[in-house]
C-alpha cells in the first residue's frame, strides 16, 4: 500500500512538473505528458 501511495505521489509530481513546463515553454509529447495535454 505504501509503495502504491509513493508511486501515485511521484506520478502526480511528474505530471505537475510536465504541465508547468508545458505552460512555460513547450510540451514534449512523451509518456503521460501527451495524455495530460
From Swiss-Prot:
Expressed by the venom secretory cell of the spine. The spine is a cuticular structure containing a single large nucleated venom-secreting cell at its base. It is an independent unit capable of producing, storing and injecting venom. On the back of D.vulnerans caterpillars, spines are grouped together by 50 to 100 to form scoli, of which there are eight in D.vulnerans. The modification Arginine amide is found at residue 36. It is found in: Secreted. GO terms for molecular function: toxin activity. Disulfide bonds: none annotated. GO terms for cellular component: extracellular region. The keyword Signal applies. Residues 1-20 form the signal peptide. Keywords: Amidation, Secreted, Signal, Toxin. Belongs to the limacoditoxin-13 family. Probable toxin. Does not show insecticidal, antimicrobial and antiparasitic activities. Does not induce increase in intracellular calcium in mouse DRG neurons, suggesting that it does not induce pain. This is U-limacoditoxin(14)-Dv74. It comes from Doratifera vulnerans.
